[in-house]
């Protein structure tokens, strides 16, 4: 198993956002974690990366426990996060943001990988000298994904990548996620856009108020009556 959480409890101050969460991400898969705002999804991502700390339970990556491991060391292990809200460096150029994604690398593929990002996102190439803060929301999301991919992750964490984006841009972002997966990167996707997430995922977890309330193959979860009513507007997710 590439990533495994067992009975993880975590939160902030007096707030417990994860109440005994267990989930697994097999290598080569796309796994999605869906749920309403405030369910604890982002806390789960931060806990995996070491930004948040688990008070109970274990997080392991490739069989290695991550307790006490610093965030930069988690990145070295092969996990990258595209955070909620993009969080690009607005006073740095597009190219500088991408270079920062590769800051722990020391190989001769960095320039080629940057060109690959520019091929995937032509608008970023056109704006490579522009500051991140001048980009549109969609372009900033492209940059956030490109920055994460520059780290050559084995596991890519995406936290609400479609948030606040126009439908056409959302489709482009999900197409890119699938392309990255096809190239060999495992994906854990947190999304409120359950329909899009369930369309591309292999396996799905549904999170409510800090607990996993449902899990299964994504196609089966998409047909669950409760999921359809709560997240899909009463309709099945089309493939």
Language-model region placement:
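Glycine-rich phosphate-binding loops of nucleotide-dependent enzymes
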Residues: 1-239
């Amino acid at each position: 198993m590439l990533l495994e959480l067992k009975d993880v409890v975590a939160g902030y101050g007096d707030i417990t956002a994860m109440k005994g969460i267990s989930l697994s991400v097999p290598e080569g898969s796309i796994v999605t974690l869906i749920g309403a705002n405030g369910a604890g999804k982002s806390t789960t991502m931060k806990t995996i990366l070491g930004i948040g700390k688990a008070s109970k339970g274990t997080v392991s990556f490739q069989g290695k426990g991550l307790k006490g491991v610093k965030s930069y060391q988690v990145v070295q292990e092969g996990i990258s996060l595209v955070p909620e809200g993009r969080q690009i460096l607005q006073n740095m150029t597009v190219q500088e943001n991408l270079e920062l994604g590769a800051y722990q690398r020391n190989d001769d593929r960095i320039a080629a990988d940057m060109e690959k990002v520019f091929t995937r996102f032509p608008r970023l190439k056109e704006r490579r000298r522009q500051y991140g803060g001048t980009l549109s929301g969609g372009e900033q999301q492209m940059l956030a994904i490109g920055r994460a991919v520059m780290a050559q992750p084995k596991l890519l964490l995406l936290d609400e990548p479609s948030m606040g984006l126009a439908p056409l841009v959302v489709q482009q972002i999900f197409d890119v996620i699938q392309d990255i997966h096809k190239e060999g990167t495992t994906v854990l996707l947190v999304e409120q856009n359950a329909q899009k997430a369930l369309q591309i995922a292999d396996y799905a977890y549904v999170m409510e108020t800090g607990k996993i309330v449902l899990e299964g193959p994504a196609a089966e979860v998409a047909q669950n009556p409760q999921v359809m009513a709560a997240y899909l507007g009463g309709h099945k997710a089309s493939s």
